[in-house]
Amino acid sequence: GLLPVQGVGEATLEQYRRFSQAVAAAGRAARFTMPQFAALDAKTGLAPAHQALDAMTFEAWLQQQGLDDAHLRWYLDYCCRDDYGAGMARVSAWAGLHYFASRHGFHAPGEAVAEDREGVLTWPEGNGWLTQQLAAPLRAQGQLQTGTSVLRIAETRRGVEVDAFNHHSGNVERWQAPRCVVALPVFVAARVVQNPPAFLAQAAQRLQWAPWAVTNIHLNAPLADRPGAAPAWDNVIYGDSNPGGLGYVDASHQKLDPRPGPTVLTYYQALGDVADARQQLATQGAEHWGRAALAALAGPHPDVLQRATRVQVTRYGHAMSIPVPGVQTFLSQIGLQGTPGKRKLLLNGERQRALPTPATARLAFAHSDWSGYSVFEEAFTRGHAAGLWQG
């Protein structure tokens, strides 16, 4: 795992055990779930224990608990940056604990761990594979319209109007429907929806987003096998000098073909803690970020410069919502207004629990932003809930 254990002292191990106990205690006080809104109370929203955690930063909570070990804090800060795009000084204590308590908890070295805890199933395309599978039946039925940018969404007395620019034809098209699922990031939805509802405008002002730089490096042959940790799917560089550096993923690590060959390394930088990061992304070209990624990888892999044949950088100005203090409490109240109208939510003919979907009379909003942080499970479940509401 990523938790530093080699050469650490007993004081560090003791803090690992104390943090493990604290995560377990937090889970007993109020359950953590993924998707997170499965744990919301239908009438009051976020549990009082979670509201208290949501009111402070994770760093402040750790200080409160007397957890100040440098190795533990490095690991926890990495986990926050990896999932939330910003470190423990910026995300809430709720978010820091949710990372562990909603999954398998935190296990200190020597503690019993379930056999399946470390099992990881991935695809070379990452979440791209999941989106391709979700899109395939829509494409087969002619229901997927790509190469189109939505310019305006407006509720009318009879339904919903959507104005969209077709990049293939160069024309603006108007689509009409009885209802619409708006699966856009909140900051985009607030600009696209005409006369946005108050909760959407408030969320756009309240939420904060982390910029990311993602660098894909094509290698014509495997990197040299060097002493140290064995190659893995997710590889973290301890002491990465790049701001926000998270290490890299090897796209071919879980290929069934055991023969070594060309591969792609994806290096990530989460820039939520970097001042003016969005401006830096906009003004510094792709070459700057590509060179930074190669320099970081050249430390553990000196032969990367000889193996690299192509470098592609993608800059995300608003990659994901950061769960800063107060966000969970705020978002938990939005879905409590209930489903507009009197329609029942049905799935396969069975009535479903009404999930807290932000909605107006004709628009249902579905995006991981409404959960305050970005993972596939949140996005998928919110889309599913919005689809049931619209159904």
Residue ranges of predicted features:
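Rossmann-like dinucleotide-binding core of oxidoreductases
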Residues: L46-H50, T57-H71, C80, R174, ...
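Active-site/ligand-binding neighborhood in enzyme catalytic cores
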Residues: A24, R28, P35-S149, G159
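Feature captures the FAD/FMN-dependent oxidoreductase FAD-binding
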Residues: G1-T12, P137-L144, L151-E161
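Central helical "cap/lid" subdomain
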Residues: T148-A232
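Active-site rim elements
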Residues: K43-Q51, D116-P124, L200-Q208, V274-E287, ...
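Conserved beta-strand->loop/alpha-helix structural units within folded catalytic cores of enzymes
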Residues: A55, E59-W61, Q65-L67, L72, ...
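Conserved flavin/dinucleotide-binding core of flavoenzymes
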Residues: Q6, G159, F165, H218-L219, ...
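Dinucleotide-binding Rossmann-like beta1-alpha1 core, especially the glycine-rich loop
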Residues: G1-F32, P48
